[in-house]
A protein has these predicted regions:
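Feature activates predominantly on carbohydrate-active enzymes
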Residues: 1-82
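Substrate-binding groove of N-acetylhexosamine-processing glycoside hydrolases
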Residues: 56, 61-62, 75-291
Length: 291
């Protein structure tokens, strides 16, 4: 077990509501984290969220809150006190579950070999911040288990744990979305080509594996996940997020379909307001394509 078990949440482009922050802290406590690191590139958004209340809530759960800037984060690497790994939520739309799992295994082994005192799970934002919070859950859950349980955590039943966290049978659906980036073999480190297609209209022509047949296959799986998750949307905000993640992937497969894009733009605002303060929403929405 690592002495320090930390989760870093990037608040540079979007800031969670107090309710969301408390829900996240509850999840961290459940998976034996003892350090919560709100991150900002420079100044912290003091006017948007009460860090005093967050710190007090962390303390109630046996967690230390440590504000972290870019300089602080880089200093962690210089001191090499932590084995660091990403949730792989950024630049993904719906996650990169297998890449995340492999990184967890490597980070735990390397941290143990050099006797690192901490295990740090990072959850950075990308320039678009379209992905819903649920996309980070597999990394948070698995990271907590690796930090406290070591290498044997690679065999954990992640789907079952996600069902418990979301209090609904959504874990398998979320993991299914989180493996679609592997289709067609167009794999990049720390990025999904489906994200590239939606955000920059690139990827399709550069990767022969991403044929229209493959994109149609991804779209079909995403629609199936959406239909299954929709049965729970009246009872679970997590289900709403899973539906939205599925729709993002579907839009990436049909990037020039204005009807799909209009629907996901409408959904974007609703999902954002579930979890985050209003600031940043317009900037994120503006990056979704229009035709």
């Amino acid at each position: 077990m690592f002495e320090r078990r930390a989760y870093l949440l990037d608040m540079t482009r979007r800031v969670p509501t107090m309710r969301t922050a408390q829900e996240l802290i509850d999840i961290l406590a459940r998976y034996r984290y003892n350090e919560f690191r709100p991150f900002a590139e420079k100044g912290f958004p003091e006017e948007l969220i009460d860090f005093g209340r967050i710190g007090a809530y962390c303390k109630m759960q046996g967690i230390e809150m440590v504000r972290t800037t870019r300089n602080d984060f880089e200093e962690l690497f210089v001191r090499a006190e932590y084995a660091a790994v990403s949730t792989e939520a950024e630049r993904s739309l719906a996650g990169r579950v297998e890449e995340m799992r492999e990184q967890m295994i490597r980070a735990e082994a390397q941290g143990r070999a050099r006797k690192a005192s901490g295990f740090l799970v990072t959850d950075f934002s990308d320039e678009c911040v379209w992905q819903p919070l649920c996309v980070s859950l597999p990394g948070i859950v698995m990271g907590g288990n690796f930090a406290s349980g070591g290498a044997r955590s690679s065999m954990m039943d992640l789907e079952k744990e996600l069902d418990r966290v979301m209090e609904a049978p959504l874990g398998g659906l979320l993991l299914r979305l989180g493996t679609l980036y592997l289709r067609g073999g167009a794999v990049r480190e720390h990025c999904s080509e489906l994200y590239n297609i939606l955000s920059h209209d690139i990827g399709y022509s550069r990767h022969p594996g991403l044929t229209q047949f493959v994109l149609d296959d991804v779209s079909g799986v995403a629609r199936g996940v959406r239909i299954a998750a929709e049965r729970w949307v009246e009872r679970s905000d997590w289900a709403k997020e899973v539906v939205y993640a599925a729709n993002l992937l579907d839009c990436a497969c049909h990037r020039r379909d204005e009807v799909r894009l209009r629907e996901v733009r409408d959904e974007h605002g609703h999902i954002w307001r579930l979890r985050f303060v209003p600031e940043g929403r317009v900037e994120s929405l503006a990056k979704l394509p229009r035709f």
